Every structure is written in C-alpha cells, then in structure tokens.
Amino acid sequence: MDIEQLREKSADELKAHLTDLRKEQFSLRMQQVTGQLPKTHETRRVRREIARVKHLLGSTK
C-alpha cells in the first residue's frame, strides 16, 4: 500500500493495519528461521510499511 492510500485512512484504521502488519512480520520471521521463506524481500517490504504507518500515526497527533 502506498503512502497516499495510507493518508486517507483514519487513526483507528492505521492502528488496525499496523497490528496486521506486525502479525505478518512475525509470520515471515518464523518462516525465515525455519527456512521456509521463498520470497525474502517480503520482510523488507513489511518492515518499511510498518515504518510508514508509524510515521503517519506520529504526525497526526
């Protein structure tokens, strides 16, 4: 999801999206540890999207 789509969301929606992203990050990390992660770039994508959401949450306060 790009930054423009994230800016359109409310703070509650961003918090829910952040929770989903953290769950996805945990799942990807577990797959990586067990050697079952074929697309290693996904961890980077999720980490960056978490940073985008946290940035928007901090700037809306």
From Swiss-Prot:
Lineage top rank: taxon: Bacteria
- Gene Ontology BP terms: translation
Asked whether the keyword Disulfide bond is assigned, the reply is no
Alphabetized Pfam families for the sequence: Ribosomal_L29
Gene3D superfamilies, A to Z: 1.10.287.310
- Record carries keyword Ribosomal protein: yes
Gene Ontology molecular functions: structural constituent of ribosome
According to the UniProt record, one GO cellular component term is: cytosolic large ribosomal subunit
Keyword annotations of the record:
Ribonucleoprotein, Ribosomal protein
Among HAMAP family, the record links this protein to: Ribosomal_uL29
Family under the similarity heading:
Belongs to the universal ribosomal protein uL29 family.
Name listed for the protein in its UniProt record: Large ribosomal subunit protein uL29
Q: Which organism is it from?
A: Xanthomonas axonopodis pv. citri (strain 306)
Encoding gene (name): rpmC
